[in-house]
Amino acid sequence: FFVCGWHIALVATHIPTYMADKGLPDWTPAMVLALIGVFNMAGTITSGYLATRYSKKKILSAIYLLRGVSIIYFIFLPPSIFNSVVFGVTFGFLWLSTVPPTNGIVAHIFGTKYVGLLYGIVFVSHQIGSFLGAYLGGVFYELNGNFDYAWYGSIALSIFAGLIHLPIVEKAIERTQPA
């Protein structure tokens, strides 16, 4: 969930400067963030629906890998309004789509009695990722005059997150029963 936080904070914090540096009109980042917000709703509902029918770990792997593809598309193709729209739609669809399957895995493995506490603990990793995505994005920009290393790191994190979810055993842990 750390990677989710990294992606979200990096994009939300630095997309205006990134797009300005690429020479896109001033209104383009606002449009991209609005598209992210709109398509986030559809993506989150869709991932929640899919998480009730398919492997949650595979859904999470797909989401993170697709985020990497979306970032690759966005940073390696020529900057344009069209490519910005495609990024806003695709990244928006994937934005918080990690939440339902992540929460589902926690509930499935550990049960629902303490799901609030356990998800709170999981969410701390999201917030650490958010801090680092926003902060290090700025550090990379100050050191290099661009966001290249922040984007490359985001792609690497996408691959890592896509792979790290695959070994998860989606099975409830055995609980000891009191005598």
Write out the residue ranges for each language-model feature.
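Extracytoplasmic gate region of multi-pass secondary transporters
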Residues: 1-47, 99, 133
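Hydrophobic core of transmembrane alpha-helices in multi-pass small-molecule transporters
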Residues: 2, 83-97
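Helix-to-loop junctions at the C-terminal end of transmembrane segments
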Residues: 44-55, 141-142
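Cytoplasmic membrane-interface "Motif A"-like loop-to-helix N-cap segments
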Residues: 53-64
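C-terminal ends and interior cores of transmembrane alpha-helices
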Residues: 66-79
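Intracellular juxtamembrane helix-capping segments at the cytosolic ends
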Residues: 97-110
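A membrane-interface helix-boundary motif in multi-pass transporters
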Residues: 139-157
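Multi-pass alpha-helical transporter architecture, strongest
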Residues: 153-179
